[in-house]
Regions:
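NAD(P)-binding Rossmann-fold cofactor-contacting core
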Residues: 37-42, 49-69
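Short, Lys/Arg-enriched N-terminal segments with co-localized hydrophobic residues
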Residues: 4-17
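Rossmann-fold NAD(P)-binding glycine/threonine-rich loop
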Residues: 115-143
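Helix-adjacent hinge/juxtasegments
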Residues: 57-64, 69-86, 94
């Protein structure tokens, strides 16, 4: 069952997220970060910077369509004119399902719901559509765990 509670952390269907799944996601190049703006106080800003430092192409997706870290922003996922590998979701859990549905519609390879962004049914939809799904984790934290 999706969202099994283990040691206080919401986990991936079937138990803890396997390290190879996270490695697979971290190995994908183009990340759209939904909720990324120029607000340097927000976690998305720092995560985007780290992803760029790790060699990823980062695409800001935000209603303001701001350029962030020198990367052109877009208002919504469907506005991005090239393929996106991972949709990293930095929005309220109530909005996450809509973003996951957009990720499915644009044929993303994976969705990453950030810490405290919880939507079990959206993750199920993503997995049923063939996407890799990670929920309640942070790629910056996962990178720091790796050599």
């Amino acid at each position: 069952m999706l969202g099994v509670q283990l040691d206080g952390n919401l986990e991936h269907s079937g138990g803890p997220i396997m390290s190879d799944q996270i490695d697979q996601m971290l190995g994908l190049k183009t990340w759209a970060i939904v909720g990324l703006s120029n607000n340097s106080e927000r976690a998305a800003f720092g995560v985007a910077k780290l992803l760029i430092e790790k060699g990823h192409q980062v695409i800001p997706v935000h209603p303001k369509a701001e350029t962030v870290h020198g990367q052109k922003g877009y208002e919504k996922l469907s506005d991005v004119p090239f393929p996106i590998d991972v949709v990293d979701i930095f929005v309220n859990s109530d909005l996450a399902g809509e973003v996951v549905d957009s990720a499915i519609a644009i044929n993303a390879k994976g969705v990453w719901l950030q810490l405290d962004v919880i939507d079990q049914s959206a993750v199920e939809r993503a997995e049923n559509a063939g996407l890799i799904a990670v929920m309640n984790r942070c790629p910056a934290i996962e990178y720091r765990k790796r050599p």
